[in-house]
């Protein structure tokens, strides 16, 4: 399953429905892993962060440059992890959500006004 860091790990204003859906996907993945592990079936999710795609907005691409890696990820980097999780080499990996975000979640947000308290516009 492809989930997202938004929802299971982080959130943003206005993303309640999206975050709930992605968080729900991870809960479903863990249940599938638990119920089917005895049959040799694994279930995992991949949680991409800032990935440069054709649908990325300029702001999303800029945000990707603020990761510790210093750039947005690529679809091929996400696909590589998916290929590994689908391979026999990952046969003992199940029930996990693996983050692919260039280390973005390990840093504290700086300069982010989460509560829009800038009174200079009034």
What kind of feature is each model-predicted range?
Residues 4:
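Residue(s) in the substrate-gating loop at a strand-loop-helix junction
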Residues 8, 43-57, 100:
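Short, flexible catalytic-loop segment of classical short-chain dehydrogenase/reductase
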Residues 9-16, 38, 70, 88:
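Active-site loop immediately N-terminal to the catalytic Tyr-X3-Lys motif
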Residues 21, 29:
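Active-site helix of classical SDR
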Residues 34-35, 91:
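Alpha-helical segment proximal to the catalytic Tyr-Lys
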Residues 36-38, 51, 86:
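A short hydrophobic alpha-helix cap/turn motif
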Residues 45, 61-93, 100-102:
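C-terminal helical subdomain
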Residues 94-122:
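Short C-terminal tail/terminal secondary-structure segment
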């Amino acid at each position: 399953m492809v989930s997202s860091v938004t929802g299971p790990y982080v959130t943003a204003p206005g993303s309640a429905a999206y975050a709930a859906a992605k968080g729900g996907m991870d809960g479903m993945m863990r249940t599938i892993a638990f119920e089917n592990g005895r049959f040799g079936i694994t279930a995992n999710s991949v949680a991409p962060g800032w990935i440069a795609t054709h649908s990325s907005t300029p702001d999303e691409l800029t945000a990707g440059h603020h990761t510790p890696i210093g750039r947005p990820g690529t679809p091929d980097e996400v696909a590589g992890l998916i290929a590994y999780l689908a391979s026999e080499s990952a046969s003992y990996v199940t029930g996990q959500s693996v983050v692919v975000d260039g280390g973005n979640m390990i840093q504290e947000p700086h300069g982010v006004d989460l509560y829009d308290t800038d009174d200079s516009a009034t």
